[in-house]
Amino acid sequence: MSNKNNDELQRQASENTLGLNPVIGIRRKDLLSSARTVLRQAVRQPLHSAKHVAHFGLELKNVLLGKSSLAPESDDRRFNDPAWSNNPLYRRYLQTYLAWRKELQDWIGNSDLSPQDISRGQFVINLMTEAMAPTNTLSNPAAVKRFFETGGKSLLDGLSNLAKDLVNNGGMPSQVNMDAFEVGKNLGTSEGAVVYRNDVLELIQYKPITEQVHARPLLVVPPQINKFYVFDLSPEKSLARYCLRSQQQTFIISWRNPTKAQREWGLSTYIDALKEAVDAVLAITGSKDLNMLGACSGGITCTALVGHYAALGENKVNALTLLVSVLDTTMDNQVALFVDEQTLEAAKRHSYQAGVLEGSEMAKVFAWMRPNDLIWNYWVNNYLLGNEPPVFDILFWNNDTTRLPAAFHGDLIEMFKSNPLTRPDALEVCGTPIDLKQVKCDIYSLAGTNDHITPWQSCYRSAHLFGGKIEFVLSNSGHIQSILNPPGNPKARFMTGADRPGDPVAWQENATKHADSWWLHWQSWLGERAGELEKAPTRLGNRAYAAGEASPGTYVHER
């Protein structure tokens, strides 16, 4: 595979990787129901359907006569090969497809269905039309060229890759070469040690790399559905290493990968375990409080913890950073498109019957929400071009999924359904009611403009639930790339704004734009809240919490 193609796959992976807020899936039953609604519409409105068939016929005539102006969107890189525009046959093939796709979307969009049924119908039609894109066939000009360049070997290699995926990957195209990485060898390599372990988590303390460190430590809490080393990928992408260079005493949680035996672990179980880790960090560093960072579902866990501390009158968290975390679950995106009472209850029932929610199941669901980027992209690369799956650390991490205990999954579903964090005392954790307005610590909330899992508008509303001072920052990236955003990227941008109106769009219109990574802005913010500089410790842990196994520990290797 050429470097250009490999770079393009990596770019799309960075923007569309699914480090998840695990709540629900899309049931096949719901998709079939929406498909039936679409088919019934053709019968119920025959004149409406005939009008669009006639319009498609007129456009098809223009295509055949070479008079059509239809062209793919400028950012649709599937059709970058010059043959799609220069070759008359390929150009007509493409324009016929574009005309058909447009007419189907217009047909359902202009129907008399309800807005929800129109959105669902458009989603189903999009699944069908993207699957039938001309780039997904052996007539793809890039595949034809590759076939002749390799003397047919690309076709044999593609069939071999397909056979492997049918056997080993549930028939889904592999997104990454899983043999290219090993956690602890070329991922998660920052030096440190496990200084505390319980049934739920391991606490890793990283070795300082500066002569002085801030007195107040930082505890990083990753999402439970994926593994912690998203914060410690390659050295140049490692947020943990960046924190160490910024003189932060850095600790990170590594969650255990639960099995059916842990099916009863709920949110309170994770909070109790996290409280033990907080006490260990404070005992090791001698600080009376710490700063905390939570991402995705880890951000929900951190939020529940600080709400619990507020109810107890304990001030163990000085400042909280939330990365792409939705607490106000009023959402209007594809994640919520098929959500209703039946869907939520079915999702809970499914995980309770299995004992756990498999992360691989959630990854498949979300892949079908972005089929071009997360399925057909790799279909073309692996099968039509006969290339090996790309070697990319983010994709390896994304495919190294974990499970969620049924009880915790049920808790997340109930939060999604009833939105309790938006109301005082509507959620109870570890025996205490949660009122986020009583949480007075400073909040740094980061969201991504292109995030299709945790929409930035929802993150903005979520930040306003707290009673402390808020710093909201909007990065020009997707879900995971918002987190993995090291300085020096010439395309990186972020926005800040002191005024915080209730309307997210109003905030965006008046926000200040900045070049480079939000990491720089965050470290400045965090440094002001991290205490005085002191001599860095020369050893990890202490007498009560002795340094044990070297990082990345044991739990990260559990499958």
From Swiss-Prot:
Its EC number is 2.3.1.-. Synthesizes poly(3-hydroxyalkanoates) (PHA), complements a mutant of P.putida that does not make PHA. The gene is phaC1. It is an enzyme of class 2 (transferase). Belongs to the PHA/PHB synthase family. Type II PhaC subfamily. This is Poly(3-hydroxyalkanoate) polymerase 1. The keyword Transcription does not apply. Pathway: Biopolymer metabolism; poly-(R)-3-hydroxybutanoate biosynthesis. The keyword Nuclease does not apply. GO terms for biological process: poly(3-hydroxyalkanoate) biosynthetic process; poly-hydroxybutyrate biosynthetic process. The active site is at C296. NCBIfam families: PHA_synth_II. One of its GO terms (molecular function) is acyltransferase activity. Pfam families: PhaC_N (PF07167). Keywords: Acyltransferase, PHA biosynthesis, PHB biosynthesis, Transferase. P.oleovorans accumulates poly(3-hydroxyalkanoates) after growth on medium chain length hydrocarbons. Large amounts of this polyester are synthesized when cells are grown under nitrogen-limiting conditions. When nitrogen is resupplied in the medium, the accumulated PHA is degraded.
